Amino acid sequence: MGGGLLEQAIGMAGFFLPRGAVIVSTEGRAVPASSFRAQTNGEDLKGRLVVLIDESSASASEIVAGAVQDWDRGVVVGRPSFGKGLVQRQIGLSDGSAVRITVARYHTPSGRVIQRPYEKGKRREYYLDHLRRYDDAARDSLDAAAPAYRTLRTGRTVYGGGGIRPDILVEADTAGFSNYYGELIRRGIVADFVGDWLDGSRDSLSRRYASFEAFDAGYTPSDEVLERLTALGESRGVKFDAEGFAVSEPLVRMQLKALAAQRLFGTGAYFRVINPAASPAYARAVAILEDWDKSGQPVLEP
């Protein structure tokens, strides 16, 4: 889950919650407290539900995850979210510009503050806190210091302190990542290559694969495609690293295939390629959904 808008978050969470259930509330020093509730009975009140989050999940996506978790409606899987939950008011200035003032913070239904703490003069600490969410030992220390709350249906313990902490923690798979591949990404070489490559290959791929299913089952980027990518890297000053490339080759092929699928069949096709192979959290979510009575429902009990 990425970021998003408040209205969409309320609508999405409301799909799974009963009428009147608090989805999110706001409170500020000079702003009256207010709550946003589900306006109708959700269309899916009892179905199996898993919400995926990670360090990039922010704002509206945290509202959805927090509401689902606090009402014990579904299982939250992945890694701690970013922690971005501020209400801002825009004030127009005479020269046509504007300034945004933070006036309140978002709270989950159990009362947890979504926004990570940001104390005056501690900007560096704020960003270090985000980095710690990638580190096992540091994350454990954050959890130990986090205030405890109770969910609203079964009374399970959940933790505040900023962001949403998943019910089931699944670490990122970094086995296929190398410094060499990271350098290709950081310099924009992969993005530039993909655009040129797909511009020249789209028609032939479309003729060969009429459906996503056929593409997914039959297509793998060739060695020649990978050689063109590394050659572009060389021309941009990224020296070829055979060892690093060997580590990242499966990841590179999968990423290129997913991007080709996106160009041919839409954004959803990208995730249909990338998630099963590259996301341990996605695989865990599927396993939970398939064995809900043993792997999902018990998580929601006290």
Question: What is each residue range found by the language model?
Answer:
Residues 1-4, 270:
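Conserved short loop/turn motifs at secondary-structure junctions
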Residues 2-3, 13-23, 27, 53-57, ...:
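Sec/Tat-exported extracytoplasmic proteins
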Residues 4-59, 86-92, 107:
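Gly/Ser/Thr-rich loop/hinge elements
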Residues 60, 72, 79, 83-148:
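Polar, glycine-rich mid-to-C-terminal structural blocks
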